[in-house]
């Protein structure tokens, strides 16, 4: 069992990675969308308002259909996922919420969560999206 200091260090590292990831993700979504799939694992799944999209080609096609966007993240939360649940794969749960305006549409509140996994490369470790769930969170007018 890790000491509480080790766990705190682990959580701090996860939070730094999540903050960096969120900045990169939403900037890429708004300004360089064609590069967005570089942030996903080859077999990643996106659930967009209940509609599933899996694999890089399908993700690319899906992102191409979206109008240009302006995301504003108002909340970020993250936590490491216990290694027993991920077969010792370093994984972080990232939850965001905020507002988004797609060109030609009204502004919406959104909630998005990501499961990020650490992928080792010869020079460093990069975080890739294994799972992404996006949902509009607009208030009911009833």
Curated annotation (Swiss-Prot):
Signal sequence coordinates: none
Alphabetized UniProt keyword annotations: Cytoplasm, mRNA transport, Nucleus, Protein transport, Transport
Pfam families: NTF2 (PF02136)
Localisation: Nucleus; Cytoplasm
Major localization listed first in the record, in broad terms: nucleus
Domain named NTF2: residues: 17-136
GO biological process, one term: poly(A)+ mRNA export from nucleus
Keyword Ligase in record: no
Domain of life: Eukaryota
Protein's UniProt keywords contain Cytoplasm: yes
GO cellular component: cytosol; nuclear pore central transport channel; nuclear RNA export factor complex; nucleoplasm; nucleus; perinuclear region of cytoplasm
Function according to Swiss-Prot or TrEMBL: Regulator of protein export for NES-containing proteins. Also plays a role in mRNA nuclear export.
Complex and partners: Associates with NXF1, NXF2, NXF3 and NXF5.
Protein's name according to its UniProt entry: NTF2-related export protein 2
Gene field: NXT2
């Amino acid at each position: 069992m890790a000491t509480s200091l080790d766990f705190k260090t682990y959580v701090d590292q996860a939070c730094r990675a999540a903050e960096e990831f969120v900045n990169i993700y939403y900037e890429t979504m708004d300004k360089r969308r064609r590069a967005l799939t570089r942030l996903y694992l080859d077999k990643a799944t996106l659930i967009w308002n209940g509609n599933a999209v899996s694999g890089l080609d399908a993700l690319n096609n899906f992102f191409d259909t979206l109008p240009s966007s302006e995301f504003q993240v108002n909340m970020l939360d993250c936590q490491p996922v216990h290694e027993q649940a991920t077969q010792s794969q370093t994984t972080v749960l990232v939850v965001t919420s905020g507002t988004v305006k797609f060109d030609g549409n009204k502004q919406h509140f959104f909630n998005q969560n990501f499961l990020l996994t650490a992928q080792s490369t010869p020079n460093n470790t990069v975080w890739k999206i294994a799972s992404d769930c996006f949902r509009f969170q607009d208030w009911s007018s009833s």
